[in-house]
Amino acid sequence: MTEEFRHYTVLLKETVDGLQVKPDGVYVDCTLGGAGHSEYLLTQLNEHGHLYAFDQDQKALAHAKTRLQKYVDKGQVTFIKSNFRNIKEELAEHGVFHVDGILYDLGVSSPQLDEAERGFSYHQDAPLDMRMDQDAPLTAREVVNTYSYSELVKIFFRYGEEKFSKQIAREIERVREKQPIETTGELVEIIKTAIPAPARRKGGHPAKRIFQAIRIAVNDELGAVEESLEQAIDLLAKNGRISVITFHSLEDRIVKTMFKEYSTVQDLPPGIPVVPEEFQPELKVITRKPILPSDSELSENNRSRSAKLRIAEKIKSR
């Protein structure tokens, strides 16, 4: 693996094995990243099986093509540079309308976090960027310097669950009146200034929640997850499975709620003794509680500590 794209794959076996891979099946990795999940899945496919792999990041795609070269040569994998919110449209262009399994790893990949110039990290000084797709127009710099006080407060509360949202937004407003905020380092100092000293000393890095909130806003991450999951459930063939790894409560809530919605029997007209086919739920939830990383995985990769895996199975086609 190239040094610049070294990535630890979280919940590798649990995620892929949870799909109950059929050797001749059609599968989708919506978050290719370092290609760890894709590689493990491809080892379980025969010459009739196929994987479609999505990523917005050109570097991730280039790395994956090298890592998965033997499967590329066999024609078993197709790479798609697109946001996974376009899953249905993109697969339709390849003549694919039903698949046997879909997986999502919703964490920011380690190389993106570690690559200073991408602006995701609050540990390194870099231009305010935070775009997953480097061709996308909206950057963190634009959010920080042009969004109103009330817009910033809403983003920080909603996406970062930050209790000092108002103080931080007010400090951003004060600083940018004098000159634009250009770097992650400047933003970190502003956040530290706005948060009372006792609060800064507990609960991890003081900028963590704000950086998460801005990243989610820049990439419309929650909207993309919701849109994509709706399409993914529709794309699944009967008995097909979906595995989703989340890393914070906002994403996990979306997955949990959607799985519950699609696995619940609809309200029936009174007096019907048997649930008719049209009222049967589409999904069966496989994981009553989310699967968490093992102690051994946590000791190898501290970034996996907040990971949660949920799995569901399609039991009825629309």
From Swiss-Prot:
Binding site for S-adenosyl-L-methionine: A35, G36, H37, D55, F84, D105, Q112
EC number of the protein: 2.1.1.199
Region annotated Disordered, chain positions: 294-318
EC class of the enzyme, as a word: transferase
Residue ranges the record marks as coiled coil: none
One function term, GO molecular function aspect: rRNA (cytosine-N4-)-methyltransferase activity
Signal sequence, renumbered to the chain: none
SUPFAM superfamilies: Putative methyltransferase TM0872, insert domain, S-adenosyl-L-methionine-dependent methyltransferases
Record's catalysed reaction(s): cytidine(1402) in 16S rRNA + S-adenosyl-L-methionine = N(4)-methylcytidine(1402) in 16S rRNA + S-adenosyl-L-homocysteine + H(+)
Subcellular location: Cytoplasm
Keywords assigned: Cytoplasm, Methyltransferase, rRNA processing, S-adenosyl-L-methionine, Transferase
InterPro entries given in the database record: RsmH, SAM-dep_MeTrfase_MraW_recog, SAM-dependent_MTases_sf
BP GO annotations: rRNA base methylation
Superkingdom per UniProt: Bacteria
A GO CC term attached to the entry: cytoplasm
Known role: Specifically methylates the N4 position of cytidine in position 1402 (C1402) of 16S rRNA.
HAMAP family: 16SrRNA_methyltr_H
Family membership noted in the UniProt record: Belongs to the methyltransferase superfamily. RsmH family.
Record-given protein name: Ribosomal RNA small subunit methyltransferase H
Natural source organism: Enterococcus faecalis (strain ATCC 700802 / V583)
Lineage of source species: Bacteria, Bacillati, Bacillota, Bacilli, Lactobacillales
